[in-house]
């Protein structure tokens, strides 16, 4: 009599599931090859995987790179993937926060250059350490440059000043 439960297959993964997981490991390995050395050093990786990731840039031919990345995927099987994903997510999050902060400062610069005294007052309220006279002078120079269609050297100085104030206020300086 044939057992209709198929208990022997309940705990096993299908071939498709295994291939999908291996493909995800290869993709994670590809992502790791794009990271800088100091970032890779923070990840909990084996020495063999670190060496394989360093060698990945040497393989430029499509077939060789694909073979090597399959090898990296194989090495990824024994890694602590949860810790790697957690650190990568943390780095993405901090990168996203940095980009949001950067865009916020760019918007402040544009508002100050295109705006009026109200925008300057709002900025000073948000950043109380602002040297009004210096900021007003930088903004005035940037406005003159913009009116004359010159390269935005003064606008860059305004941004640098705003960024320095932001870093000072957040305790990064």
Curated annotation (Swiss-Prot):
Keywords: Cytoplasm, Ribosome biogenesis, RNA-binding, rRNA-binding
GO terms under biological process: assembly of large subunit precursor of preribosome
Tree of life domain: Bacteria
Localization in the cell: Cytoplasm
Pfam family, one: DarP
GO-annotated molecular function: ribosome binding; rRNA binding
Matching CDD domains: YjgA-like
GO cellular component: cytosol
Keyword hit for RNA-binding: yes
InterPro entries given in the database record: DarP (IPR006839), DarP_sf (IPR023153)
Biological role: Member of a network of 50S ribosomal subunit biogenesis factors which assembles along the 30S-50S interface, preventing incorrect 23S rRNA structures from forming. Promotes peptidyl transferase center (PTC) maturation.
Family of this protein: Belongs to the DarP family.
Name the UniProt record assigns to this protein: Dual-action ribosomal maturation protein DarP
Source organism (scientific name): Pseudomonas putida (strain GB-1)
Phylogenetic classification of the source organism: Bacteria, Pseudomonadati, Pseudomonadota, Gammaproteobacteria, Pseudomonadales
